[in-house]
Swiss-Prot record:
Protein name, per record: Proteasome inhibitor PI31 subunit
Record's GO cellular component terms: cytosol; endoplasmic reticulum; membrane; perinuclear region of cytoplasm; proteasome core complex
Encoding gene, per UniProt annotation: PSMF1
Organism in which the protein naturally occurs: Homo sapiens (Human)
UniProt-recorded Gene Ontology molecular function terms: endopeptidase inhibitor activity; proteasome binding; protein heterodimerization activity; protein homodimerization activity
InterPro entries: PI31-like, PI31_Prot_C, PI31_Prot_N
Length: 271
């Protein structure tokens, strides 16, 4: 039990009861498992510092001891509470990260000789049993639960993105057009209006000009270069441009006769 006697000697002036001696032993056992004491109380304080010694004010309350510890690599932090209940002491340990809890109840008379608190060699009884109970009841359960929590949620690593995913300006590889299907137009498709606007580099399809006389069969297309009073000069309307004709439709079939199905009484001059 190397180190326990030195720790007891440093804390001897403050050890005045059985529970003080037991908390001193508990502190030593926690430190031997790679932890450092930080301070007292539930919350961090301005005077916190890593130390193997008991912090100042560790036994101000003989009924409730509250100590905080941190593992040597900073991966784990413990909150240890020791509660005195008549001749017993209840030990409760919380690991902050995983929120795992372990507790242990010890009979003070089984391990502490209250008549010889000033003599280290006579203060503790059944030291090996006490140490075994602390390790099996607190240290081991906390470590096992912490390791299990880390294994159940491992850190996932994703492979780096390829150049094609991260470079939006990358030029795609060139493929010969030997197997490309020749473009063709579908004169019977009644719902291809605007298709060429959506895919300007694809095969020639319907533009934004809708032929109201289209009934599923090829007909004479509306001349998009029609203007007033004559046709627009060649090249005024680029191929595939968004352009509405603003003049007569020229050679296309005429519109409906305004005298066809006239309204009743249209020729009555007295109406």
């Amino acid at each position: 039990m190397a180190g326990l006697e030195v720790l007891f000697a440093s804390a001897a002036p403050a050890i005045t009861c059985r529970q003080d001696a037991l908390v001193c032993f508990l502190h030593w056992e926690v430190v031997t498992h790679g932890y450092f004491g930080l301070g007292v109380g539930d919350q961090p304080g301005p005077n916190d510092k890593k130390s193997e010694l008991l912090p100042a004010g560790w036994n101000n309350n003989k009924d409730l001891y509250v100590l905080r510890y941190e593992y040597k690599d900073g991966s784990r932090k413990l909150l240890v509470k020791a509660i005195t209940v008549e001749s017993s002491m209840i030990l409760n340990v919380l690991e902050y990260g995983s929120q795992q809890v372990a507790d242990l109840t010890l009979n003070l008379d089984d391990y502490i000789d209250a008549e010889h608190l000033g003599d280290f060699h006579r203060t503790y009884k059944n030291s090996e049993e006490l140490r075994s109970r602390i390790v099996s009841g607190i240290i081991t359960p906390i470590h096992e639960q912490w390791e299990k929590a880390n294994v159940s949620s491992p850190h996932r690593e994703f492979p780096p993105a390829t150049a094609r995913e991260v470079d939006p300006l990358r030029i795609p590889p060139h493929h010969p057009h030997t197997s490309r299907q020749p473009p063709w137009c579908d004169p019977l498709g009644p719902f291809v209006v605007g298709g060429e606007d959506l895919d300007p580099f694809g095969p020639r399809r319907g533009g934004m000009i809708v032929d109201p006389l289209r009934s599923g069969f090829p007909r004479a297309l509306i001349d998009p270069s029609s203007g007033l009073p004559n046709r627009l000069p060649p090249g005024a309307v680029p191929p595939g441009a968004r352009f509405d004709p603003f003049g007569p439709i020229g050679t296309s079939p005429p519109g409906p006769n305004p005298d066809h199905l006239p309204p009743p009484g249209y020729d009555d001059m007295y109406l």
